[in-house]
Amino acid sequence: MKPHFRNTVEPMDPRTFVSNFNNRPILSGLNTVWLCCEVKTKDPSGPPLDAKIFQGKVYSKAKYHPEMRFLRWFHKWRQLHHDQEYKVTWYVSWSPCTRCANSVATFLAKDPKVTLTIFVARLYYFWKPDYQQALRILCQKRGGPHATMKIMNYNEFQDCWNKFVDGRGKPFKPRNNLPKHYTLLQATLGELLRHLMDPGTFTSNFNNKPWVSGQHETYLCYKVERLHNDTWVPLNQHRGFLRNQAPNIHGFPKGRHAELCFLDLIPFWKLDGQQYRVTCFTSWSPCFSCAQEMAKFISNNEHVSLCIFAARIYDDQGRYQEGLRALHRDGAKIAMMNYSEFEYCWDTFVDRQGRPFQPWDGLDEHSQALSGRLRAILQNQEN
């Protein structure tokens, strides 16, 4: 039997949406969780079969949370539509709590014909280890069915507004900080789920051939260490990668460089007054403006040391040399990536699936030449 679409959604009030789907990372007083869901067949051209809105209170019993309400509703719905594979999409104001995440993971394991994509406006108790583990199990890619979880960007907020809000023809108006908050939450989710980079993305963007062209993206991998008894101890909860935000993508009209996205993220970690070492591995060295902002950061945070390893030197025919010298003068360690740094990034940040790092032709020669060029740039500050 071919199911038919049933429009059972009572649209959400615009003020309710704007208030509850605020993507400010840290919010208090919003105790209601909203879940907007859409069910389709896996045929991408097919129309929605059903749509619902669920709500619940974060501090109520788990059975009253919207995720559990969805599971009960979908169990009944599935009995009438058991002969096909379905794609379920959620837009939620808070990501699932531990118990709900575990229940959803169990549901997906029992019904492999259902795929679930979860777009979240905010992360709920993301700093708690049990919560982190529950989300990793829910989104685990290997070993069985899993959910795909993403942070809502401008497009998802707009889609949710168009599908579930009584906007009366008015377009979605994003908050001013939506892009910045998106970047923070996306990086945090990447840390939490331990996202890894596609091998092709790494080899394409971190190739240190001097004649590379057409690479307009900057990737930045990072790790954080804390000094304890004269030993640098890795803080694996603050390890990941991000890239620049291109213009007009995710609500950034002018775009935002990867280094600035990274600087936005650091205060979110709430590092205390102990000594920390932050190491960045970048596909391009910082431009003048980013170098200035990074220099300002280390000047204002003397307990944090910064090391930057770049695959290539970004030469915009502008003041990039001046920026690198200022960054170096203010205490940052700047060097070109060599074989050991490329291998470390491959082993740490790439979904290599057991494959060892394979250097490209000329890697060592290019690294030596770039190191000499960088050395000349930095030494010029003393001339």
From Swiss-Prot:
It holds the Pfam family NAD2. PROSITE patterns: CYT_DCMP_DEAMINASES_1, CYT_DCMP_DEAMINASES_2. The record marks N244 as: Interaction with DNA. The modification Phosphothreonine is found at T32, T218. (Microbial infection) Antiviral activity is neutralized by the SIV (SIV-mac) virion infectivity factor (VIF), that prevents its incorporation into progeny virions by both inhibiting its translation and/or by inducing its ubiquitination and subsequent degradation by the 26S proteasome. It is an enzyme of class 3 (hydrolase). It comes from the Eukaryota. Residues 29-138, 214-327 form the CMP/dCMP-type deaminase domain. The active site is at E259 (proton donor). Its EC number is 3.5.4.38. Residues 1-68 are annotated as: Essential for cytoplasmic localization. It is found in: Cytoplasm; Nucleus; Cytoplasm, P-body. There is a cross-link at K270, K333 ((Microbial infection) Glycyl lysine isopeptide (Lys-Gly) (interchain with G-Cter in ubiquitin)). (Microbial infection) Following infection by simian immunodeficiency virus (SIV), ubiquitinated by a cullin-5-RING E3 ubiquitin-protein ligase complex (ECS complex) hijacked by theSIV Vif protein, leading to its degradation. The CMP/dCMP deaminase domain 1 mediates RNA binding, RNA-dependent oligomerization and virion incorporation whereas the CMP/dCMP deaminase domain 2 confers deoxycytidine deaminase activity and substrate sequence specificity. This is DNA dC->dU-editing enzyme APOBEC-3G. The lineage of its organism: Eukaryota, Metazoa, Chordata, Craniata, Vertebrata.
